[in-house]
Amino acid sequence: MASLKDLKNRIGSVKSTQKITKAMQMVAAAKLRRAQEAAEAARPYAQRMAAVMANLSTAMSGTPGASPLLVGTGKSDAYLLVVMTADRGLCGGFNTNIVKKARERINALKAEGKDVKVICVGKKGADQLKRNFASLIVDKMELSGEKTITGATSVRIGDKIRHMFENGEFDVCELVSAEFVSVISQKPRAKVLIPAIDAIDEGVERPDLGGAVYDAEPDEETILNVLLPRYADTVILSALLENVAGEMGAKMAAMDNATRNAGELIDKLNLVYNRTRQAQITTELTEIISGAEAL
C-alpha cells in the first residue's frame, strides 16, 4: 500500500495536470470561436465563386480550348493527395482519423493500379504517413509558424499543386481533410480539386438561371483562366479553415474529457488517502491501548 506521503504527492501532481488541461481547454475554446468565425466569413465568397464557376464551366467544358485545370488531362492514371492535418497533437483522434482516410484512399487507388503522390500539410500527418508511404510523399508543409490561416497560405499550397500539374506529375488532385460538422464531430473527407469541373459538380448546385442569358467579357475562356487558380485557392483556404476549426473542436473536447478524468482520479485518490490515514490512526490507537494495558 502506498504511503500517505506518496498519495499526497500523487494528488498534487494530478491537480497540477488538471489545471493545465483546463487552461488548454479554455484556449482551444477561444481559438475555436475565431476559427468558426473565419470559416463562416469565407463561406459566402466561396459559394458565390463556385456559382460563377458553375455557369462558366457549363459553357466551356465541351470546347476544345478548355483549360486542363477545368476539364483535366483526359486521363486518371496519376493522383496527387493533399493530406491536411494539424502540426500538434492533444486533439483526440482528429489527426488519426484524417490519416486513416488518406491511407484508405491511397490503398484503394494503388489497388486500381494508379500512381499516387502525397503532399502533407501538417506535421502529424507526415509523421504518421511516412511509416508506410514514405516513398509517396513528395513535399511536406508545416503551418505552426503562421499565426493565422490566410489567403497567402492557400496560394502557397495552390502554387505548388499547379506547378506539379503543369509539369505533368499527376492527372487528378484530391484534398483529404476534415469537414467541421460540430465541436464533437469532424468528418474526414476526400474532395476533388483538379479537374475543377469535378470539384464544381461535387460542391455546388447549379443555379436555375430562369432562362436568362449571361454575356462574359471579354470571353468565358479568358475569365476562366483567371478564375481557375483563384477558385482552387479558395477551395484550399476553405479546407484549411475547416481543418483548424475541427482541430480546435477536437482539442477542446479532448481537454474537457481529460479535465473530468483528472477530477475523478483526484476523488478516488482522496478516498484512498483518507482510508489509509484512518487505518494508520486506528493502528496507532490500538498500539497505544495495548501498551497501556500491558502496564
Curated annotation (Swiss-Prot):
Protein name, as recorded: ATP synthase gamma chain
Protein's job: Produces ATP from ADP in the presence of a proton gradient across the membrane. The gamma chain is believed to be important in regulating ATPase activity and the flow of protons through the CF(0) complex.
Main location: membrane
Annotated compartments: Cell inner membrane
One Pfam family cited in the UniProt record for this chain: ATP-synt
GO terms for MF: ATP binding; proton-transporting ATP synthase activity, rotational mechanism
Subunit note: F-type ATPases have 2 components, CF(1) - the catalytic core - and CF(0) - the membrane proton channel. CF(1) has five subunits: alpha(3), beta(3), gamma(1), delta(1), epsilon(1). CF(0) has three main subunits: a, b and c.
GO BP terms, alphabetized: proton motive force-driven plasma membrane ATP synthesis
Gene Ontology annotations for the cellular component aspect, listed alphabetically: plasma membrane; proton-transporting ATP synthase complex
Topological relation to the membrane, as annotated: Peripheral membrane protein
Tree of life domain: Bacteria
Family that this chain belongs to: Belongs to the ATPase gamma chain family.
Entries under InterPro entries matching the protein: ATP_synth_F1_ATPase_gsu, ATP_synth_F1_gsu, ATP_synth_F1_gsu_CS
The keyword Membrane belongs to this UniProt entry's keyword annotation: yes
Species whose genome carries this gene: Maricaulis maris (strain MCS10) (Caulobacter maris)
HAMAP family in alphabetical order: ATP_synth_gamma_bact (MF_00815)
This protein's UniProt keywords: ATP synthesis, Cell inner membrane, Cell membrane, CF(1), Hydrogen ion transport, Ion transport, Membrane, Transport
